[in-house]
Amino acid sequence: MSYVFINDSSQTSVPLLQACIDGDLSFARRLLETGCDPNIRDHRGRTGLHLAAARGNVDICRFLHKFGADLLATDYQGNTALHLCGHVDTIQFLVSNGLKIDICNHNGSTPLVLAKRRGVNKDAIRLLEGLEEQEVKGFNRGAHSKLEAMQMAESESAMESHSLLNPNLQNSEGVLSSFRSTWQEFVEDLGFWRVLLLLVVIALLSLGIAYYVSGVLPFSASQLELVH
């Protein structure tokens, strides 16, 4: 057997729980279909899901889940169904439906710790170990992502504070932004070619004024000789 019962009895006065112990799928199904409470407990606080999982009755676990059994239910020791099972298919079913592999009971024991203590088969142990390792890696990735997000937020906050503490920087950014907006509106209103023609005319007028004032034609041969 790949499981060890924990101070268990093979008899109970509750029909559904007895069906879960015996692995009687058809009887359990009839009881559930006639309205039996899927979360009914025994004197140790264990539900049918606990008892079916402990014996590897995964089909009964599925039916209990289908009829509303609480997968997160714990017994009076804080054990989930996953703490009591030692079968690969039952472990896979419970984990795939939301049970956490690293959840601890009232004594701080995880399903893996109890499985090793009970001496379940090696395949179940390896599965639990692999699932715990995945959980740890996922937690580390999540923590790293949160740390990066916090660092980015702090950096943005520092930049904003620097901008607020430096009014000259803030004013210059505002002036540049205003100038860009005004220039874009100006170009859109006149049209690109008209603006280009206007700039050419302004440039020619500037050259004419320079010649009138200095008497020297800009970019003339004499100016180039002086430069050399």
Curated annotation (Swiss-Prot):
* InterPro entries recorded: Ankyrin_rpt, Ankyrin_rpt-contain_sf
Enumerate the UniProt keywords alphabetically: ANK repeat, Membrane, Repeat, Transmembrane, Transmembrane helix
One cellular component (GO) term of this entry: membrane
* Recorded topology in the membrane: Single-pass membrane protein
Span-the-membrane segments of this chain are 195-215
State the PANTHER family in the record.
Answer: ANKYRIN REPEAT DOMAIN-CONTAINING PROTEIN 39, ANKYRIN REPEAT DOMAIN-CONTAINING PROTEIN 39-RELATED
Q: What is this protein called?
A: Ankyrin repeat domain-containing protein 46
Species name? Danio rerio (Zebrafish)
